[in-house]
Swiss-Prot record:
Encoding gene per record: glpK
Stated name of the protein: Glycerol kinase
Residues binding ATP, per UniProt: T11, T12, S13, T264, G307, Q311, G411
Reactions catalysed according to its record: glycerol + ATP = sn-glycerol 3-phosphate + ADP + H(+)
Amino-acid positions noted as binding ADP in the UniProt annotation, renumbered to this chain: T11, R15, T264, G307, G411
Length: 500
């Protein structure tokens, strides 16, 4: 039997999952690593922590599965997107900590670019908006703030990569500097229509072309690992950013299929097929995957705070000890209270895109307690998803509640309470799959497709299995009342921004 090893390098932990040829899971390993918050709105990782935790989990997963490197047909990599690493081409030493996708330090840079009128052209080429979320301004910040970095970059001494690219470079012993189209499409430097790095964008952000990796299909020959890492060489043949990998793992290969992943943040992608759809509602146009040189596009909405809001309940407020307690606690809340949490801890993502605002609670009374806060926290994720859902339906002419199929994954989907409330607020069914490791499965599929372990997308889609369908059960009047309250809460938060 052939096995495929998936590396799932996330925001708070690195994971490795061994899949069998029938897509069942043979072993899982996970290791958390430290987060660094050197200033308000700043989030960093040590690249060496990312690398070490990745290698350790891969070795652990192989041991748990009882297999050797020779049993692995291929490795697939999926990663936290946009997180930016710049390192020395000769030594592999990072010149600065990785700047994480959540980091907002470049808000002023982005504001100036917008004020100077660059956003329409940038958006037309990249499908993105000018925002600190994306890699381009993070690279520029590193080059401008690390002594000597810009000069070294101009001399061709430094390399840039998203996390997949950095891991691939390390896995191959510095022999391969490459990424895939999905990760490239998140940098603010890549033209999603031509499939090339864009010289105008590079000039705008003053990023030398020599720093950039080669861009390949999501399923391709990316090189082989050095034999010393895992006891023998293993080829790497699949790469995709985490949200695109989840889209593939959910078998959303048909236009109109939508997946929503609930981890630290929440990310929804709607497959729009071979044609990029320009959003009129501040959604992103991105590459869902690229196979055989053919790009498939998606509309994407990004929510910065989802699971991390539950972490706030646990670590910040101390009202729960474990995330699993949140749903049962929320179920005990006072139905007469209408408490809303707008979790803009690092600003608001789609469809508002405001990095300056911060979170707020609305509707507090003397009787508001832990149950109401838990209720508001879980509901905030559902409300934010509704905002994305509504924007996608408005942007895509073929969309309707009847035509969009929503498949969910990620840690928060284990909460039946949250998924039922999501179906209620969307007034649409929500499908939870049997295999929850959809992000890793997507990476494994891309690698296994190239290695001949897995079939073409249409046949792979036949293996998708439903675990539970949540059907809407809320009255229209209640739904509208709740959504109106959420809209007022968001309006209140946006009004607090001095820049508005």
């Amino acid at each position: 039997m052939s096995f495929v090893l998936a590396i799932d390098q996330g925001t708070t932990s690195s994971r490795a999952i061994v899949f069998r040829s029938d897509i069942s899971i043979a072993a899982v390993a996970q290791q958390e690593f430290p987060q660094h918050f050197p200033a308000s709105g700043w989030v960093e990782h040590e690249p060496e922590d990312i690398w070490t935790s990745t290698v350790m989990t891969c070795r652990d997963a192989l041991d748990k599965a009882g297999i050797k490197a020779k049993d692995i047909a291929a490795i697939g990599i999926t990663n936290q997107r946009e997180t930016t690493v710049v390192w020395d081409r000769a030594t592999g030493q990072a010149v600065h900590r990785a700047i994480v996708w959540q980091d907002r330090r470049t808000a002023d840079i982005c504001a100036k670019l917008k004020a100077d009128g660059y956003e329409p052209d940038v958006s037309a080429k990249t499908g993105l908006i000018i925002d600190p979320y994306f890699s381009g301004t993070k690279v520029a910040w590193i080059l401008d703030h690390v002594p000597g970095a810009r000069e070294r970059a101009e001399r061709g001494e430094l390399l840039f990569g998203t996390v997949d690219c950095y891991l691939l470079w390390r896995l191959t012993g510095g022999r391969v500097h490459a990424t895939d189209a999905t990760n490239a499409s998140r940098t603010l430097l890549f033209n999603i229509h031509t499939g090339q790095w864009d010289d105008t964008l590079l000039k705008l952000l003053r990023v030398p072309r020599s720093m950039l990796p080669e861009v390949k299909d999501s399923s391709a020959e990316f090189g082989t690992t050095t034999p010393d890492l895992f006891g023998g060489p293993i080829k790497v043949s699949g790469i995709a950013g985490d949200q695109q990998a989840a889209t593939i793992g959910q078998a959303c290969f048909t236009p109109g299929m939508m997946k929503s992943t609930y981890g630290t943040g929440c990310f929804a992608l709607l497959n729009t097929g071979a044609t990029p759809v320009k959003s009129n509602n501040k959604l992103l146009t991105t590459i869902a995957y690229q196979l055989g040189g053919v790009r498939t596009y998606a509309l994407e909405g990004s929510i910065f705070v989802a699971g991390s809001a539950v972490q706030w309940l646990r670590d910040g407020l101390g009202i729960i000890k474990h995330a699993a307690e949140t749903g049962p606690l929320a179920d005990k809340s006072d139905s007469m209270q209408s408490v809303y949490l707008v979790p803009a801890f690092v600003g608001l993502g789609a469809p508002y895109w405001n990095p300056r605002v911060r979170g707020a609670l609305f509707g507090l009374t003397r009787n508001t307690g832990p149950a109401e806060l838990a209720h508001a926290t879980l509901e905030s994720v559902c409300y934010q998803t509704y905002d994305l859902w509504a924007a996608m339906r408005a942007d895509w002419p073929d969309a309707s509640a009847a035509t969009i199929v929503l498949r969910v994954d990620g840690g928060m989907t284990a909460s039946d309470w949250t998924m039922q409330r999501l179906a209620d607020l969307l007034d649409a069914p929500v499908d939870r799959p049997m295999i929850q490791e959809t992000t890793a499965l997507g990476a494994a599929y891309l690698a296994g497709l190239n290695a001949g372990v897995y079939p073409e997308p249409e046949k792979f889609a036949d293996n998708w299995r439903l675990e539970h369908r949540f059907k809407p059960a809320m009255s229209a009047a209640t739904r509208q009342r709740k959504l109106a309250g959420w809209a007022r809460a968001v309006k209140g938060v946006l009004a607090s921004d001095e820049g508005e």
